[in-house]
């Protein structure tokens, strides 16, 4: 073979290159398979890295570039901290309002329900991750509601000189119907979240599944287990009560100090032994007595306030019931006004800051890898300059730790899903490039990732000849913030409109990374036959095959070398295929076996095709996309302004072109539509569940009238938290929180209305019954609201990246329930009397006794 050809043994031609901190590099990606544990895989890799450097050639180092398990560990750590803090705050709150012994047994229901829910969620195929863990935190304050109501009622019955067991049974029976149906209505409020579509739908479904499982086991615990504890366990001394309460407190605090399961067990045994000794020798009796007396004084003052000041307030609200409703309606309008005024912008899925800032470069298709490499080098140098500036500003913790640059590929892209670490990659090409900055964890730096990306964008400026240069700082997105799809038959017309739309978008401050999906293809040679070629018996297909064999090559065979297949390619030498002129010198074989010059039988015309042809419903489409700096403007504001006239005028001038919103806007619309029908069904089921225990068709409507006020409370909650830069506005997770709040607030109203009906049936007048019911149920209703709020407080005030997208849902639920509590205690009694007034007008004059009986 050497007599007729040159044989070279080498690697396949490629345009791809990689540099890590300025040095040539290669990436090894380790991925999990099936249900493998990412934390265990990471531990194994780290153990290997501790011993691997000894066997590497000189000058070769191993560095962990993108550890996705760190994100999971940070998220789990953040949410576990929020869970511990929330549970501790709930426990303290219970101890303030209830006896320590009662607070202990109510709080014990939380881990019992969690254990049951963990078993059930595992059976349903869920795993412990950041989303499912948020579901446990979300339900933390909710699932003690039924236990609080049952426990408080049992405690009240036991104080009436009954035995512990009799008080536990009677207290549970009296309140079991509204408690059971209240939990069922709460579950119904979460069911629509199971039906959502897209990324948000998947997140909402996981959260809803966890919450529903927890509520089921919480109901079982409050109706069967809690009464058994309260009916048989009596603590004779104050020290014994405090000892019981300190068990969960110590258990939570030890979680902060234990480094593994064994250390936790050891510390727990030690602390329990110490507490037992203190209790046995009565060393803690004095402190315990003072604590119990303080709690009793606080509880007595709360009772005095409820029976005096609050009673008068409720009586006045019922007496001036139409004025009360007017104030409630004004409050409702205030929330609507906040949204309509634009002071609380809506964003479907606010971007989550990553610990990477990425610049993605796209040159015209066909650009040589050398030209792209120069542009990537420029981006890399601008990144190094920025890193140096930031290290001077923050010498103690430089924000930039590593710089990775790639030519011929964009390794962070996975179908546009955002930064995910090299290795997945988009399809390669010499016209593609990317530079990635690895940043220190968000909690360890002052500047957020978007600010660093914006500084880098300003530092780099524009790249001459670049088709697209995007700077990305988000962990993931559900689509482009602005994505306008144009469809039509005329490609030239679509390009003209796309150019005009890009120019219009550039006039908005804060709109960045504007581009469209139209891409010219590579330069190509279009072959055509001459009459001489036809006369020689050549076809265009035969000609194309010979040109491909000469310049790309023909695979002659494959040779097995170890684990690799080595392809043997036959083609012209490098010098004979470097230029277009080489084609003119090529010899073409005819069917007769002779060889004639290419220029004799064919000609080649230089031109460009399309990089890709996109069609929707058989029509050509071009997408105009852009990102927004949400600190300046939102995508909704831009699109609202465009829809106000510009887009209509554009379509009127081009009647054959259609327009649609894609990306984040389409995801938002589809998700909202997917929730509407399930939510309406859930409302109907809630109405039915309320009508069953109340034996009324109108009283469920009265109870459900508090739902809009929960939404208004959530809106004002976002407005308040926005002042502290904890939320930017409303988001899709805010909507999910509002849906969840609907079921929780209905629970409290049901218990209140059920109590009114019971008091009326026992012979009280209607006016006295509504006031006495509000006074009787005031403490448990306030306590259930406060436990929900304080259980979510650590998460609401969490500023870490891991909790960013969860905060809006927590804000909606916490503030929605809190504001609706006031409505429940003051407005629901007034609404009850208004319904009776309306019923009296419809039925006509009746005796008071008959009216009272029919109202029940």
Model region roles, listed by residue range:
Residues 20, 73-89, 669-683, 811:
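N-terminal membrane-entry
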Residues 88-96, 100-156, 195, 213, ...:
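Hydrophobic transmembrane alpha-helices and their membrane-interface caps
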Residues 4, 45, 75, 90, ...:
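Residue-level signature of catalytic and energy-coupling elements of molecular machines
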Residues 224-229, 236, 798-855:
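Hydrophobic alpha-helical transmembrane segments of membrane transport and translocation systems
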Residues 1-13, 24, 36, 40-62, ...:
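Surface-exposed amphipathic alpha-helical segments in non-transmembrane regions
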Residues 193-202, 255-264, 287-288, 325, ...:
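Transmembrane helices with small-residue packing motifs
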Residues 175, 236-286, 294-347, 852-856:
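Signature of alpha-helical transmembrane segments and their immediate interfacial
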Residues 65, 72, 76, 151, ...:
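Helix-loop junctions and hydrophobic alpha-helical segments within the transmembrane domains
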